[in-house]
Amino acid sequence: DRLSHAYLFSGPRGTGKTSTAKILAKSLNCINGPTPEPCNVCANCERINNGSSMDVLEIDAASNRGIDEIRELREAVKFAPVDGRYKVYIIDEVHMLSASAFNAFLKTLEEPPHHAIFILATTEKHKILPTILSRCQIYDFNRITVEDTVEHLSYVARQEGVHFEPEALNVIALKADGGMR
């Protein structure tokens, strides 16, 4: 029942790390929450779904890997949430941050404001500083099995009224290499 201030979601591409981060952000900020299952219809959930929430910020570390961006984050984190209970910072591809950016970010992870939650996502956990890892609750995501991928593709096709050959779904699932994208 205790909430961590920092999570690290690690695993291959397409295994749901960023999607899970957004679901967690909705669970924390849903008007009916905090709840294990966000409603997806309240104003907070809708804003998170369409990317317009002032309380959930997604940062692509592959594009914003420098110390200046992390300094901006350190300043922004001081401000309380606008609509929800928490400000959630989702930092995708966090392993791409420069060493100086990691060190600047460490200070924020060591003394986070009570309203800030950090969700770091990576495909390369081994590139993240041990001092960062030690401050995160770590969740390892695994490749999705071919069977589960076929089952999901079949479900989506039926929902959309699309005819399919089961063998074709199996080929697609094999080519997906454990990712659901």
What are these regions (language model features)?
Residues 139, 146-170:
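Helix-loop-helix "sensor" segment of P-loop NTPases
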Residues 165, 176-181:
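The conserved phosphate-sensing helix
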Residues 1-138, 148, 156:
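P-loop/Walker A NTP-binding region and its immediately flanking N-terminal helices
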